[in-house]
Amino acid sequence: MQFLLWSTGLVALLSWLIYTQETQSASCRCRPWESCWPSEELWNSFNTSVDGKLHRLRPAAHVCYGPSFNRSACDNILLLSRDSGWRASNPGVLQDWVWEAGETANESCPVGSLRTASAVNSCHQGRIPLFTVGVESTKQVQEAVRFARKHKLRLVIRNTGHDLAGRSSAPDSFQIHTHRLQEIQFHADMRLDGSNTSLGPAVTVGAGVMMGDLYAQAARHGYMVLGGDCPTVGVVGGFLQGGGISDFLSLNQGFGVDNVLEYEVVTADGELVVANALQNQDLFWALRGGGGGTFGVVTRATMRVFPDVPVVISEILLEAPQAISSSWTQGLSIVLTALQSLNHDNVGGQLVIAVLPNLAVQASIKFFFLDATEAAVIDRRMKPFLTKLSRANVKYTYSSKNLPHFSSNYRQVPDIHSDNDYGVLGSTVAISQQLFDSPQGPEKVAKALANLPVSAGDLIFTSNLGGRVIRNGELAETSMHPAWRSASQLINYVHTVEPSIEGRAKARERLTNTQMPMLYALDPNIKLSYRNVGDPNEKDFQQIYWGPNYGRLSNIKKKWDTDDLFFSKLGVGSERWDSEESDEVYFFSYFYLEGINTLKVARR
């Protein structure tokens, strides 16, 4: 009798599983080998609807391999591969090879010496999408979204390809490339439709505009813009939807999302909507920190701009033969104490530590004295800190310069990649004001940075928070983790990756299991990371990125995107999908004779 009951239960369970497999298979993304994949006729029809902007996509380096080999074209690719601007505009390449390659050595198409280093003799698609639409209008974005939804394609939203967690690519995917949406329009007195309330000067920016281009245009209009320091990062993509931390200006002006006034978004049903404080307020809240590529395709955004002002920049340079030494640690402690002190006077600064090929270390800390015009005055203000360095026998060099406009500080030249073909992975941890402003705070941070195991080529740098970031907590309603409003500094760690699949796996393991636990242990008051530069293996991403806001974000996601057309790695709702977000993850339980047990997660 017991066997009969067990057998009956097992048959019922298997029948239920088969039913689930059949009825829920439509939830998974369609792959090229499946019957659901669009026919050539459908692709051609779609291409007509987007004015011929659809292209079959091959990795940019395919001209260096096999039947596609072309010597002059390959040499040109090798030359261009160091140009970040070229990488931003080319949909078949990312800013870093790490997320171009698949999980095995035969799933990549590397450029340059990577070909030898990874022993790849042929070109494979890897994580580069199969098709791309180089959209030039919101209508084309709408058509692309509707096509992806209708055919259940794995959709990737890509702007400049800077994402360090692999969100700009995915295997067997369909890409919307927003880089050609290049609108820049300034408003002397911004007002939302239906409102007479003045919001001050602002700029409307298309999804494809890069930081350097916006800075240049803003300078011509007498403005400075809160943004990142890399000129080829897109303004409106992950930066302005994931938080928008400015290394230099967040102390004085807050986060990028604090200063967004309006988004224009193509939603999962292909509709174009406006989200601001007066309409679609839930979507507006979610986009202000909920992460890019998650709630829709943002085609443009409007954000505040600020009067361009003069600035004096002072810089202290330190150098040591090795990171673990008392003199190096003491030097870091002194310059971080200077940062602590000057932050109280709204003077922002940034510390950058570089590990040289011989494992010697260099540090540069710059301070930005806004509205200052005389370098000599600032030099006198910096003298007490320089005296401390001298008394501690720390070798340093000091310089200062005054610029008539802060916007002049931004680089107006293309980013140049190193020629060693190494990739990078990165992550971040926030340091609370409670720790950093304590008497021992700078020393504790200095010791943690000095003791962190590093490799040649690694970078560690800080981003200045505090100040307006904290004060905006009472003013700006954003979806960022509330703990940001008590954070003083952000520590960014960029780890080099050897040019091989094995090197990538080793780097990811070391980042997740060694370096990040050490950095998180620095401040027990806060466990917080910046999603835009977060560990791609982060297990507790919901809490670490959004904390108590995650539940509301998840509900808004379900409202605006019921089928999860938009998703990104470690994004809102991504826990419902597998690691490449192509197959849904199902949890189910069954009754066993001895009680209730939970089966293992089944992936299809």
Curated annotation (Swiss-Prot):
Residues 125-308 form the FAD-binding PCMH-type domain. Glycans are attached at residues 47, 70, 106, 196. Pfam families: BBE (PF08031), FAD_binding_4 (PF01565). Its cofactor is FAD. Gene3D superfamilies: 3.30.465.10. Its EC number is 1.-.-.-. One of its GO terms (molecular function) is oxidoreductase activity. GO terms for biological process: indole alkaloid biosynthetic process. Coiled coil: none annotated. Keywords: Alkaloid metabolism, FAD, Flavoprotein, Glycoprotein, Oxidoreductase, Signal. Belongs to the oxygen-dependent FAD-linked oxidoreductase family. FAD-linked oxidoreductase; part of the gene cluster that mediates the biosynthesis of fungal ergot alkaloid. DmaW catalyzes the first step of ergot alkaloid biosynthesis by condensing dimethylallyl diphosphate (DMAP) and tryptophan to form 4-dimethylallyl-L-tryptophan. The second step is catalyzed by the methyltransferase easF that methylates 4-dimethylallyl-L-tryptophan in the presence of S-adenosyl-L-methionine, resulting in the formation of 4-dimethylallyl-L-abrine. This is FAD-linked oxidoreductase easE. It comes from Trichophyton verrucosum (strain HKI 0517).
